[in-house]
Curated annotation (Swiss-Prot):
Keywords: Acetylation, FAD, Fatty acid metabolism, Flavoprotein, Lipid metabolism, Oxidoreductase, Peroxisome, Phosphoprotein. It comes from Pongo abelii (Sumatran orangutan). The modification Phosphothreonine is found at T281. The gene is ACOX3. A motif (Microbody targeting signal) lies at residues 698-700. GO terms for biological process: fatty acid beta-oxidation using acyl-CoA oxidase; lipid homeostasis. This is Peroxisomal acyl-coenzyme A oxidase 3. The lineage of its organism: Eukaryota, Metazoa, Chordata, Craniata, Vertebrata.
Length: 700
């Protein structure tokens, strides 16, 4: 391993080209190669290099600077590229189970090239595929083979035109006909059309369609998933009774064809029901493998968490790209200085450090969290596949649902805010489309909305926590969960007695300080939210009204504080484990502390309101600690970016290239733009067709 770290394996981690970034790279307190190996592992680094090299050397993936593709051409190109990924077969189904994190790595690599490509591949292979795998049974395994041979192309159809977040109001129906042993899939009207479904617009042949299941006697058993063929696999023409189309151009991710579908009494075989959670006999009797409704609900929620957990990873990859661009720019862009003769890199300014370095720390913390949560989800899926119907399995589903529901908002919002900060931190050059920050901002934007509106998802998490507290108050139950994310709440009366007692900045430079504060904050917000909820109910509000009245100032911050605590806790434990190389402990500790304290600082008002903070000193120490950590990480920033940044071809930003030749790269890219030096094709409109001043002025 040592020879690899020191450059013995130059093919795996080649040296960066010399240039203006050399000075910062020389100042780093650690070896970026050693950190890359510790963070990813040699096998994963080789996997990433294989993917990136294949894309860079394949003409189908060639970049076209300045090209404005038509919507139709972009969709075609994205599909061809998605098909090529299957031809490369970077990751077999067997490998997915042997090394689950390679799934996330593949998605991140594709997303770094183009978010539309990652989304298209993800929806077909992981979201559609995992829905069948986790919700279906042996009779559906043939679909898995067809998915990875690309004999069919899939999508996940839950949302409707008039309902998205409120899944209980979904109106597509599936009535069982025992005479023919078929389900009749039907959209009662256009408002019940499946809508916003990725891959459905032009390419999907099959959909996992969620519909309300009815058995004879009009007894409804709630939402269930069905495999429904929507297009002929040979002609891509709609199947009988299916109206399917594309919803049009979006603000971003336009390589992905989002679509709609209506079903007019479409008959599908009884076996089309994905029946792991519930089934219908040939005679029309509904049977469920879960006797307890709560267990059934928890398992169902967990099986639907795939896309939300994946979105966390998709969001973080966008932040990786944006921060890599902005920090390399900041290390080479010189403006002003202590004398008129000397200009210094803008990264030397505390303001630039404060704007960007917390997002660099967020990348490391959230990336680790997304991987750990993905592995937790794999554990849940394996339990479902093995037929585990234990109470622990159901509770694991509820806990993962709560964590996924809050981590998607945290990751997507952090990324959206971070990309905007990066865009502004790069000044006017950041506004040039060729530097990619605008594209990243638009492509990340839907992460805040699809698979659940962020603010509504946070209510799922706060409801989970409130339910645990109610169970404890009413039944004396302990706070316990399979992943131990809530176990600390058992000590909440004692935690609420604690105060912030750190008096110096030096004592604050550890994520353990923020961990203690976060535990107090979650306990405080949980108690306050619970009391507020009960107060509203005693005042005559219904449960629905009471929860809505509590959400803005109580439930929302509770959910965010809880997931931030979980991220901080996991990253803190990760960087303080004994296996961390001594040469990496300091920089990883600073990243952990910076993310924790920076995140905590946004809750300062609540910490004061609840009495954990008192006096001016607490807030001042927190602010000063964040600035001190930014200053300490400033010289490591470029090396930390080198660990997370993809090759220049993938990054695709003249101002973010690894050689640091900011102006040469930008000038060259501008001169290569199509028609950059040509006069406008409409030049006669100025030179020949002069305006007759006042000719259109009203004579009245």
């Amino acid at each position: 391993m040592a020879s690899t770290v020191e450059g013995g394996d130059t093919a795996l981690l080649p040296e960066f080209p010399g240039g203006p970034l050399d000075a910062y790279r020389a100042r780093a307190s650690f070896s970026w190669k050693e950190l890359a190996l510790f963070t990813e592992g040699e096998d994963m680094l080789r996997f990433k290099k294989t993917i990136f090299s294949a894309l860079e050397n394949d003409p189908l993936f060639a970049r076209s600077p300045g090209a404005d593709l038509s919507l139709e051409k972009y969709r075609e190109l994205n599909f061809l590229r998605c098909r090529r990924i299957f031809e490369y077969d970077f990751l077999s189904v067997e490998d997915m189970f042997k090394s689950p994190l390679k799934v996330l790595t593949l998605i991140q690599c594709l997303g770094m090239y183009d978010s539309s490509l990652a989304a298209k591949y993800l929806i077909h292979s992981l979201v559609f595929g995992s829905a069948i795998y986790s919700s279906g049974s042996e009779r559906h395994l043939t679909y898995i083979q067809k998915i990875f041979r690309m004999e069919i192309f899939g999508c996940f159809a839950l949302t409707e035109l008039s309902h998205g977040s409120n899944t209980k109001a979904i109106r597509t129906t599936a009535h069982y006909d025992p005479a023919t042993e078929e389900f009749i899939i039907h959209s009662p009207d256009f408002e019940a059309a499946k809508f916003w479904v990725g891959n459905m617009g032009k390419t999907a042949t099959h959909a996992v369609v969620f519909a309300k299941l009815y058995v004879p006697g009009d007894q409804c058993h709630g939402l269930h998933p069905f495999i429904v063929q929507i297009r002929d696999s040979k002609t891509l023409l709609p199947m009988p009774g299916v109206m399917v189309g594309d919803i049009g151009k979006k603000l971003g991710q336009n390589g992905l064809d989002n679509g709609f579908a209506m079903f007019h009494k479409v008959r599908v075989p009884r076996q089309s029901l994905l029946n792991r959670m519930g089934d219908v006999t040939p005679e029309g009797t509904y049977v469920s493998s879960f006797k307890d409704v709560r267990q059934h609900f928890g398992a169902t929620l967990g099986s639907l968490s795939w896309s939300r957990v994946s979105i966390v990873s998709l969001a973080i990859l966008n932040l990786k790209l944006a921060v890599a661009i902005a920090l390399r720019f900041s290390a080479t862009r010189r403006q002003f200085g202590p004398t008129e003769e000397e200009e210094i890199p803008v990264l030397e300014y505390p303001m630039q450090q404060w704007r960007l370095l917390p997002y660099l720390a967020a990348i490391y913390a959230l990336d680790h969290f997304s991987k750990s949560l993905f592995l937790d989800l794999m554990e849940l899926q394996q339990g479902l596949a093995s037929g585990d119907r234990s109470a622990r399995q159901a509770e694991l589903g509820r806990e993962i649902h709560a964590l996924a529901s809050a981590s998607k908002p945290l990751a997507s919002w952090t990324t959206q805010q971070g990309i905007q900060e990066c865009r502004e931190a790069c000044g006017g050059h950041g506004y040039l489309a060729m530097n990619r920050l605008g594209v990243l901002r638009d492509d990340n934007d839907p992460n805040c909305t699809y698979e659940g509106d962020n603010n509504i998802l946070l209510q799922q998490t706060s409801n989970y926590l409130l339910g645990l507290l109610a169970h404890q108050v009413q039944d004396g139950a302990c706070f316990r969960s399979p992943l131990k994310s809530v176990d600390f709440l058992d000590a909440y009366p004692g935690i609420l007695d604690q105060k912030f007692e750190v008096s110096s900045v030096a004592d604050c430079l550890d994520s353990a300080v923020a961990l203690a504060a976060y535990k107090w904050l979650v306990c405080y917000l949980l108690r306050e939210t619970y009391q507020k909820l009960n107060q509203e109910k005693r005042s005559g509000s219904s449960d629905f009204e009471a929860r809505n009245k509590c959400q803005v100032s109580h439930g929302r911050p509770l959910a965010l504080a809880f997931v931030e605590l979980t991220v901080v806790q996991r990253f803190h434990e990760h960087v303080h484990q004994p296996c961390v190389p001594p040469s990496l402990r300091a920089v990883l500790g600073r990243l952990s502390a910076l993310y924790a304290l920076w995140s905590l600082s946004r809750h300062a008002a609540l910490l004061y309101r609840g009495g954990y903070f008192s006096g001016e000193q607490a807030g001042e120490v927190l602010e000063s600690a964040v600035l001190a950590l930014c200053s300490q990480l400033k010289d490591d920033a470029v090396a930390l970016v080198d660990v997370i940044a993809p090759p220049d071809f993938i990054l695709d930003s003249p101002i973010g290239r690894a050689d640091g030749e900011l102006y040469k790269n930008l000038w060259g890219a501008i001169l290569q733009e199509s028609k950059a030096l040509e006069r406008a094709s409409w030049w006669p409109e100025f030179s020949v067709n002069k305006p007759v001043i006042g000719s259109l002025k009203s004579k009245l």
